[in-house]
């Protein structure tokens, strides 16, 4: 049966988008000419070039349009849209390696400050937000977008909603990362942790994120599967809540429409409260809810076992939604924040122990009857160890929110160790495991190029994590104890520089651990590249039709 022919004319969507990008390019050229500072001029010129490239791609798409529409099904299966997933998977590995490398550089700068080289562009103050944004938002964000687009298609048994919209999301999101990252190197920042991009980058992200939400929702609405799979609940919670947090924390008043500088709309303790309501829930919904969606899809899929308890996943979801959003004030213990607010944040943080560990138990117990696979499947082992790190981090976090513990841990390297046990152990490993699954699926390969390389990656990265977090735990507790030590006369027993000197060996160990983690990521990148290049294609068998009842 022949496929329906396509009219050799641009669609309304293509025409409209081409006009919008052409107008954007024109406005960006004007903005670059009238810019009040060099970074804004650079970003305006970069945006103009990107807009022109977008127009070219849309026009080229028109000229290279095939004679017929792509089939709705291939061998009885929906013809899924894998292009945006492949793009985001590639960008995840690119930004991941870049972010890990920058992390190694700044860890080395803390151990050997001369490595700053007195150059502003590579100083610790500019590279640190570049590292956090590259790892959290560039690496983690691309993993979440790629996996969410894959999971929502497969679990709903329909092609991703929209034609250009998914591509707009993945390319637009990575352009935001490029603007934000180059801005940090040029000294453009709002000085709000995890929310450093200036006003124009925030506006662009808002547009991209709204389209992301619409694509995801539209795919769910047109689903052929009556049930909405649990992973999609967590993805939707992540997308919606991050939108609310972004809009709440980032209102800013630009000094000029042609300058990069702006002032945050909030002030004083209100700004601090908004910032850590955002900052903590960026952890809660970007780095937790989104990656729990990965856990709930990829572990059962890899283990070939159903989720241990669907009822527990429902409890886990709703408890996480209602409790996490209130826990932000524990970042502001012993500050000008009202004491009742600090106590409220501490209370909700402690309550988070229960749903977090419920989710961990659900993930681990999914392997019931398949524990032997941990010996033979390093990808599944990586996914399961990530859940163990999730449990450890979600125990340590509530414990550190208790005021008496926080009085020792706050502002010390213990917090850095806690963050990285979650970031490297939980987010890193579950992302690696997901990409090891996703790349062969998206590129239609029978399997990975080498499971031995996955095994090497697992052990090298695990050793790196253990070195990193152990060094930070010891240095953080030592730091806190030295800061609070007094002589019999009531004077500080140690000067500040003495506490810094005591940290030096631990900073060297941290850099070594980060280096091992980077080596593991490079092994992974090679393995995935070879999987795509030389991996054996998987033959898709037709789906047998179910007999009518």
From Swiss-Prot:
Main location (coarse class): membrane
Q: Which residues form a coiled coil?
A: none
Q: Name one GO molecular function term.
A: heme binding
Compartment(s): Cell membrane
Give me the residues that bind heme b 1; low-spin, please.
Answer: 131, 420
Q: Which family does it belong to?
A: Belongs to the heme-copper respiratory oxidase family.
Note from the entry: This cytochrome oxidase is probably a cbb3-type.
Know the name of this protein?
A: Cytochrome c oxidase subunit 1 homolog, bacteroid
> Gene symbol?
fixN
């Amino acid at each position: 049966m022949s496929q329906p022919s396509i009219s050799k004319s641009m669609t309304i969507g293509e025409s409209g988008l081409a006009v919008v990008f052409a107008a954007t390019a024109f406005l960006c050229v004007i903005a670059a000419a009238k810019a009040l500072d060099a970074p804004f001029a650079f970003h305006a010129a970069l945006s103009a070039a990107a807009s022109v490239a977008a127009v070219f791609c849309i026009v080229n798409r028109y000229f290279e349009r095939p004679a017929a529409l792509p089939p709705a099904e291939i061998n009885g299966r929906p013809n899924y849209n894998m292009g945006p997933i492949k793009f985001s998977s590639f960008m995840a590995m690119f930004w991941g390696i870049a972010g890990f490398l920058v992390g190694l550089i700044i860890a080395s700068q803390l151990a050997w400050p001369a490595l700053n080289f007195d150059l502003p562009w590579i100083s610790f103050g500019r590279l640190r937000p570049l590292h956090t944004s590259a790892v959290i938002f560039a690496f983690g964000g691309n993993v979440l977008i790629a996996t969410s687009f894959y999971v929502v298609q497969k679990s709903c048994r329909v092609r991703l909603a929209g034609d250009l919209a998914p591509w707009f999301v993945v390319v637009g999101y990575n352009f935001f990362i490029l603007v934000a990252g180059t801005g940090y190197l040029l000294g453009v920042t709002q000085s709000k942790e995890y929310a450093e991009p200036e006003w124009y980058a925030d506006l662009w992200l808002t547009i991209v994120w709204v389209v992301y939400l619409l694509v995801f929702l539209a795919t769910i609405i047109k689903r052929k599967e009556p049930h909405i799979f649990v992973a999609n609940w967590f993805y939707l919670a992540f997308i919606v809540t991050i939108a609310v947090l972004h809009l709440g924390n980032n209102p800013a008043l630009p000094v000029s429409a042609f300058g990069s500088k702006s002032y945050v709309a909030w002030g004083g303790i209100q700004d601090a409260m908004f910032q850590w309501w955002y900052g903590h829930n960026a952890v809660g919904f970007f780095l937790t809810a989104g990656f729990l969606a990965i856990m709930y899809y990829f572990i059962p899929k890899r283990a070939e076992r159903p989720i241990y308890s669907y009822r527990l996943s429902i409890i886990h979801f709703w408890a996480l939604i209602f409790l996490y959003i209130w826990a932000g004030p524990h970042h502001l213990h012993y500050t000008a924040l009202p004491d009742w607010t600090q106590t409220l944040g501490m209370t909700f943080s402690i309550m988070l122990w229960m749903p977090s560990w419920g989710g961990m138990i659900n993930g681990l117990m999914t392997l019931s009857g398949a524990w032997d696979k941990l010996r033979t499947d390093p990808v599944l082992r990586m996914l399961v160890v990530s859940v163990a790190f999730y449990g450890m981090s979600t125990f340590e976090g509530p414990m550190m929110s208790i005021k008496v513990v926080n009085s020792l841990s706050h502002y010390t390297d213990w917090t850095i160790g806690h963050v990285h046990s979650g970031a490297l152990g939980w987010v890193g490993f579950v992302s690696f495991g997901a990409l090891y699954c996703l790349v062969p699926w998206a590129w239609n390969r029978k399997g990975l190029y080498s499971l031995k390389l996955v095994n090497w990656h697992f052990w090298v990265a695990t050793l790196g994590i253990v070195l990193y977090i152990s060094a930070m735990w010891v240095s953080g507790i030592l730091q806190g104890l030295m800061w609070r030590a007094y002589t019999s006369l009531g004077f500080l027993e140690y000067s500040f520089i003495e506490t810094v000197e005591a940290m030096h060996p631990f900073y060297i160990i941290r850099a070594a651990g980060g280096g091992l983690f980077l080596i593991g990521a490079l092994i992974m990148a090679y393995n995935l590249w070879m999987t795509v290049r030389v991996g054996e294609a998987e033959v898709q068998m037709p789906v047998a039709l179910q007999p009518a009842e």
